[in-house]
Structure formats: C-alpha cells, structure tokens
C-alpha cells in the first residue's frame, strides 16, 4: 500500500529561502506581465526576448524556492491507493498494472492476455477532473467572474488541479498523488537545452509556449492576491511559478475531450488510469460511452501477459509530441514539418489564382506540411502548387473553359496533371523551397548524428537534437522526392506524352494517389499551435490556449476520429469579450493575459 501522506507546502528545508512577501512577488510579476505583453519581436530577436523573459522567471523562481506544494515519497508509492480508489468508484482495474518501463517512463503492463479490440479499460465520469467539476469546486466563484478562465478551459483545468492538490481531503488526491512531479516539456528545459532548437521550426512554438505560460502566471498571480473571489482558494498563500508550470504541463500532456453529460457539447478532462498508457503507431481506440457515462478503451492489438499496453495518441508530429507531451517518438509515421506558402498579391495573376483556389476550397496563404512518409505532400498542397504555377491560359481553362468544374475537382489528383510544364514547375519550386529551408539550419544531418552519440547529453538535450535532425531529414527527403518527380515530368514533356483525360475520373479534389488519409490535415493550421504562432494577436491568444496546445498525452482526444481542443472551437465573440473584460479589469487586478 502506498505511503499515506498529507499534501504539504515547503516553507523551509534544503534550499528554501526566507518567506517572500506577496508585494515583492507582485512587483516582479508586474514586470514580467509587461514584458510578456509587449509586441512580438522582429525577425532574429526571439531568442533575445526569450532570454529576457527567462531571466525574470528565474528570479521569481529563486525567491519562491521551497514554497511549492509537494508530496512525501515517490509517485509509485501511491499507485496502490489509485487502484483502490478507482475500483471503489467503478473503474476497471483488472488485467493490467502500472510499471516503470525505464526510457518510456511509467505505463500499463498486461497481467493477462488481452485480445485486439477487447474492452479492457473504462473510467466513469465521476473520476474525471473536468471543466465542469472545476466550476462546481472551490474555484467556481472565481471562474464565474474571470473571463480568461471561462474562455480557456485548459487554464481552468490547471487551476482546478492546483486547488485540489492543495486540499488534503480532495476526492481526487489518490489520482493527483500519482502524477509526475515534473515533466520533459520545453517549459522544463534549461536554456542550453533550448539552444539546441535554435533555427528549427519548432523553436518558435517553444518560445511562444514559454512566453504565454509566463504571462498567464503573472496575470493570475495578481488575480489570486487581489480578487475577492480568490480569498478562499487554497492557493492564496502559495501560488508559485513552479506550481503553475507543473499544473500547465500536467494538463497539456493529459487533457482530452469528452462529451458533457447531456452530450450536447464537449469539455476538457483529465482521465485517471487511462492517462498512464504510452503511445505507439496505430488507430484511436478510445471513445466515450454516453449510455454508461464512462470513457472506454479497447485494445489496439493483441497484448500478451507481461507486455506493455499501448494506445495511439493521434496523428501528431514529433514537434507536437516534444512541445506538448514531452517526448520524442522514433519512427513516427505521422511526422511532418510546416511549410508556409502563399500567392503574392503583387503577382499579376493573383486575382485569377485566388479565384481558382477559392473554388477548390484552398486559401491563398496557409501553413501546409511536408510529410515523413511518401508522398511528402498532400492532395491539397499539390492542388495549391498547381494553381501557384499556372499560366494565364491554364487559369482561364480552370475558370471559364470546358469542364472547368471537373478541372477544379481534379486539382489535387496526381493522376491528372494540369500540364507537363506545370508539373515540372511545381516540383522545381518545391525542391528549391525545401532546399532553402535546409540551409537555415546551423548544423548538418551528419553533425546532428555525431552529437547524438555523445553520452553526456541530457534526456531533454537528446530530444531537442532528435527533433532538429528529424526536421532536416524530412526536408531532405522532400528535396529528393521533388527532384525525382521533376525529372519524370520533364521527360514526359520532352516526349510529348499525352495528358490523361481528367473527364474519365469521378475522383474528388482530395481523392488523390498523391494525397493521404490525413487530409484535410494541412489546413488545420496544425492545430492549436496555429501555424508557428507568429505575431500572436490578443484574439488569437484567448481563442487558443497555449497551455493546451495540442498537449494530449493519450490521443487526439477521447472521441474517435479526434476532434481538437476546446479552445480551437471557442466562439470568437466570446474570446473578444474575454479579452475586453480582462483589459477592463487591469486597473483593479492586472493587464489582460495575451496568449
């Protein structure tokens, strides 16, 4: 049986500092909020801003050292209590056990043979920590008054977790005591570990995540110290950055969507037991049974007794896994890198290209993706590139010519080129673009592989270098693939080969051999990460919770086929009101949080 323990707040002991007055921290957090609320830095200035923000955060952390909430013992000491609590409240606890798998960390191990598609795990709603349970908790009064909490479910869930952790008699203590004491998300990276990500695509999201989390903490520190509805929160006397970083990471690595009790909408939830499962390639096998009001998971494959039980977290890139889940997944069949493309408004054919793209349902500017698997581009990216490289005559054919509608619908089908010349142009463009992106990195693929052989690297440093290496390998594969395609279509053009007759096809825009089953992935703005989060506006901030940002440790969500996070679906007007409300209250509490 796990060691019984009451939650405690460390106020003395090794490394603990003298008690710091709230006023002193208020001054520091005000400075931090001001710094984090400044306009986005110009090109090449992101690292400088990151270091400045980090310096302030570290100053706060140093003054708060020893004041964070902790538990006695190790998390595994409390596993028996978790299993007992889960069993007493209707969850399944037979057929598996929690085990430390070393490199993968803790996970579930089968204690009997489990067949593929067999229901082996279910967790009833009463055990879940949700936005709804947050509203009905001690956090409720503040939630009802704070627009940021209302607009950003992930932050509400993080505060719910903090409040329950600080309450020894909380119903969820058996679960909370088994959560990791720290994570490997970039919020926990040392400055030198983040430095390994410089010049990568992922580093922009890392900077944004860190800045947004610091801004949130600074804003809510003042709220907790000054808002009348925060007086009864157990965080009143101790709300440290360390605590908030832990809560944000716990939520971003574990949150999932489930239906509300009436099934009319979705809400965010933490799901005990189930969130112990580690990831592998496959399909989402978790759903929510509204009739029995419980989360259910069937086996992804046959698992023999003694084997680790895996689930599929969703079609996420390694950048998403590292930033939002804190791990790198080798051989990720869904890995990809972003590529921002757009038709220039100075292009004399802009209007015609924009019209063709609009008819195909594709924006004139978007974040697409280059994939790890073949083919490296999706049907929508193929369609965009075809339009991007069209001549005036080809554009007219797609707008006014015979069978113009059919031409639009086959834009994304690799079997029906617009023209051989168009294919040569688009693959040449893609080859050049990917080559240019490769040149922006400060190290080569060979250099990264050499560095990884250094056994002195920390786990997080290795993860960062693997991510850097993975980006370059995807780009290199795209260059090679584009070159092969370019030469193939050049040969077709030289031989004056007849073009396939598109009229014979009933295939739609996205039903292409060049496409893949992930569509329309490339037009999702790559989820809550919203592109690379350049020049985040206040509205973008509130409608997209950085703490959430795709941070699903156990799957895209708990509903099959993976809808996205609550924040992605926020009504824009509600988000706008949330910001305005936060702004209006700045004179009383703090400036608005701008994520």
UniProtKB/Swiss-Prot annotation:
It catalyses: L-histidyl-[protein] + S-adenosyl-L-methionine = N(tele)-methyl-L-histidyl-[protein] + S-adenosyl-L-homocysteine + H(+). GO terms for molecular function: actin binding; histone H3K36 methyltransferase activity; protein-L-histidine N-tele-methyltransferase activity; transcription coactivator activity. Residues 10-20, 549-563 have a biased composition (Polar residues). CDD domains: SET_SETD3. Pfam families: Rubis-subs-bind (PF09273), SET (PF00856). Keywords: Actin-binding, Cytoplasm, Methyltransferase, Nucleus, Phosphoprotein, S-adenosyl-L-methionine, Transferase, Ubl conjugation. Residues 1-22, 549-595 are annotated as: Disordered. It comes from the Eukaryota. InterPro entries: Rubisco_LSMT_subst-bd, Rubisco_LSMT_subst-bd_sf, SET_dom, SET_dom_sf, SETD3, SETD3_SET, SETD3_SETD6_MTase. One of its GO terms (cellular component) is nucleus. Its EC number is 2.1.1.85. Phosphorylated by GSK3B, which is required for recognition by the SCF(FBXW7) complex and subsequent degradation. Ubiquitinated by the SCF(FBXW7) complex following phosphorylation by GSK3B, leading to its degradation by the proteasome. Protein-histidine N-methyltransferase that specifically mediates 3-methylhistidine (tele-methylhistidine) methylation of actin at 'His-73'. Histidine methylation of actin is required for smooth muscle contraction of the laboring uterus during delivery. Does not have protein-lysine N-methyltransferase activity and probably only catalyzes histidine methylation of actin. The SET domain specifically recognizes and binds actin, suggesting that it does not accommodate substrates diverging from actin. This is Actin-histidine N-methyltransferase. It comes from Callithrix jacchus.
